From Swiss-Prot:
Residues reported to bind [2Fe-2S] cluster: 52, 54, 73, 76
Originating gene: cmah
PROSITE patterns for this protein: RIESKE
Domain Rieske: 12-110
Name of the protein: Cytidine monophosphate-N-acetylneuraminic acid hydroxylase
Protein family according to the UniProt entry: Belongs to the CMP-Neu5Ac hydroxylase family.
Pfam families named in the record: Lactamase_B_3, Rieske
Enzyme Commission no: 1.14.18.2
Protein's organism: Danio rerio
Length: 591
């Protein structure tokens, strides 16, 4: 069975991209004659093959369309709204399979990408067999961590059981069951969806490695390796399996699983299909467009994120339009859109059981009270209520730590209250102790690192990072926990056009961002060569920008494309030592 790959089906050069009009654009690949539709609105692009899902007819402009969103099939006059990729005539029929539209920031070209094969789970199909009560159970542990028991096997998803995520910004909302760590130790295999620290939790894996260093852990073959930081972390795990996308991995005669990529973040995000005796469980985790939007219909169980708020935007921004009322209105609208999107996705896929998870975190540290109060999140109960209104045959599950879903019982009678067992009365549900000092002391240890006695660490670090030839200037200011400038802290400019470090902003026209970073997190990131997710997703900075533009190329580089090996700070200190011996009083000079 060949691995699933992403390939380009149509490429438009920059001039052709600029010529795309708002609304519907019909395009043809002159090399193979295949036809496509590109819909443009508000600078956003959506695309699909020009082929009706009913019987393969070609779409043309719909003369009855008044808003420029609908095309009509020449065969049986079916109509497709390309703004939503939903067929509107007949209603409630199909969703069009969407292509990923990728704009190049280098040359302005556009590529339409398609996964091949698009639905690999259909390979080697298995008929669903009857299940006995207790044969398949799902136990919710906390956040994105579930334990799947299938026959004699136990599989754990994304174990984050202790410690913070994103340096110090995220903490567990739910108290894991008392035996959660024991369950992890006894698992037959572990799936970790991606490298973010609320899924790949090194504090958790440190505990695991002491007793089970050889436990089989499975990850997808992402371009940025999930365990890129393993050696530096000091965690000893010896049985990490990187598997190709879209290929069944057989655990035993009845149990198998398949890892799929995300359409928006294929470099890091993955999702999972597990099948036992022909019964499928779909876990989309954090994927924005899991498997590029093409997913199996009618699975037995579907799980997905739901909460929102997994980003510093807009809470950590200030100046300009970023008033408290603007932030509150934006957050309210974004959460509502996410809620409706998840409900629509469930409606389109029609799983037998749906569970919202992977959103149970809190900004627990007292210094992040503002974030906690501002960063409101969706309610899983509200999402499930919305789903029940449109999916009458879907059982919804709002999990609590230790609650158990028995799949066989649920499938036999979805109204059977015994299908879901909640934790005993009096069980502690929410955490109230996170051992802040233990983990913040680890961050604080970086503040006094030897490299920060030499101001040229800045030049050395950004040369290591390797981002340049981009007309952006940033000012980075080290602060205390409350984002007040730190006495004796570094305050510097970086000009990424030529990767220089001026004392004043250049006179030429340029984009500008001012970034205030908590000193313990920033220095921890610098010393260890970590990604800037700890700063941005962890709410550990405050930002303003002029103009108010998101610089994707810059943030994508510092969040996903930094070198896999940390800066060689020993080499840096050797240079500094040699420079001092030569009589320099500046510390060092790094070319």
């Amino acid at each position: 069975m060949a691995a699933q790959v992403s390939h380009t089906v149509l490429r438009l050069e920059a001039e052709d991209v600029r010529n795309l009009k708002d609304g519907i654009n019909f395009q043809k690949n002159n090399k193979d004659g295949k036809c496509y539709i590109i819909y443009k609105a508000n600078g956003e692009l959506r695309a699909c093959r020009n082929q009706c899902k009913h019987q393969g007819g070609l779409f043309i402009k719909d003369i009855e369309d008044m808003d420029g969103r609908t095309v009509r099939c020449t065969k049986h006059y079916w109509k497709l709204n390309v703004a939503t990729m939903q067929y509107v005539n007949p209603p409630d029929s199909f969703m069009q399979d969407e292509l990923e539209a990728v704009l190049s920031e280098t040359d302005g070209s556009l590529e339409l990408l398609e996964l091949n094969p698009p639905d690999p789970w259909t390979a080697e199909p298995r008929e669903a067999q009857d299940l006995q009560a207790g044969e398949i159970t799902l136990t919710y542990i906390t956040h994105a961590c579930m334990e799947l028991k299938a026959g004699e096997r136990r599989m754990m998803f994304d174990p984050w059981l202790t410690g913070p995520a994103f340096a110090r910004g995220w903490w567990l909302l739910h108290e894991p069951p008392k035996d959660a760590m024991d369950r992890l130790m006894e698992a037959d295999l572990v799936y970790i969806s991606h490298m973010h620290s609320d899924h790949l939790s090194y504090p958790t894996l440190q505990h695991l490695s002491k007793k089970r260093p050889d436990i089989p852990i499975y990850v997808g073959n992402t371009s940025r390796p999930v365990f890129w930081y393993l050696e530096k972390s000091g965690v000893n795990l010896t049985n990490i399996n990187v598997v190709p996308f879209g290929v069944w991995q057989n655990v035993d005669d009845h149990l198998r699983f398949m890892i799929l990529m995300d359409g928006v973040h294929p470099e890091m995000d993955t999702c999972l299909i597990v099948e036992y005796k022909g019964h499928m469980i779909l876990n989309t985790v954090d994927c924005t467009r899991p498997n590029n939007g093409r997913l199996p219909h009618g699975v037995d169980v579907m799980m997905s994120d739901f909460a929102g708020g997994a980003s510093g935007f807009p809470m950590t921004f200030h100046g300009g339009k970023y008033t408290e009322s603007w932030k509150a209105n934006f957050i309210k609208n974004e959460r509502k859109k996410l809620l409706n999107y998840k409900a629509q996705l469930v409606k389109s896929l029609q799983p037998k059981i749906y569970c919202p998870f992977a959103g149970y975190f809190t900004e627990a540290h007292p210094s992040d009270r503002y974030i906690k109060e501002t960063n409101t999140k969706n309610s899983p109960a509200e999402l499930n209520e919305l789903i029940r209104k449109s999916c009458l045959n879907t059982l919804t599950w709002t999990p609590l730590p230790g609650s158990v879903l028995d799949l066989a019982v649920a499938l036999n009678n979805r109204s059977n209250e015994t299908a879901i067992t909640d934790p005993p009365h009096g069980t502690k549900i929410y955490k109230d102790n996170w051992e802040f000092d233990l983990y913040l002391n680890q961050l604080n240890a970086s503040i006094s690192a030897e490299i920060f006695k030499h101001k040229h660490w800045i030049q050395y670090y950004y040369n290591w990072a390797g981002f340049r030839n981009y007309n952006l200037v940033i000012r980075v200011i080290e602060t205390d926990d409350d984002f007040q400038p730190l006495n004796g802290g570094f305050d510097y400019l970086v000009d990424f056009l030529d990767l220089s470090f001026p004392t004043e902003r250049p006179e030429r026209e340029h984009a500008y961002e001012e970034i205030k970073n908590r000193v313990n997190v920033m220095r921890h990131v610098v010393v260890n060569g970590l990604l800037w997710d700890d700063l941005y997703i962890g709410f550990n900075n405050r930002m303003s920008r002029d103009p108010d533009v998101y610089h994707h190329k810059f943030w994508n580089h510092f969040q996903t494309e930094l070198p896999l090996s940390a800066p060689d700070w020993q080499h840096f200190l050797q240079i500094c030592s040699q420079t001092q011996e030569n009589g320099s009083s500046n510390g060092c000079s790094v070319s």
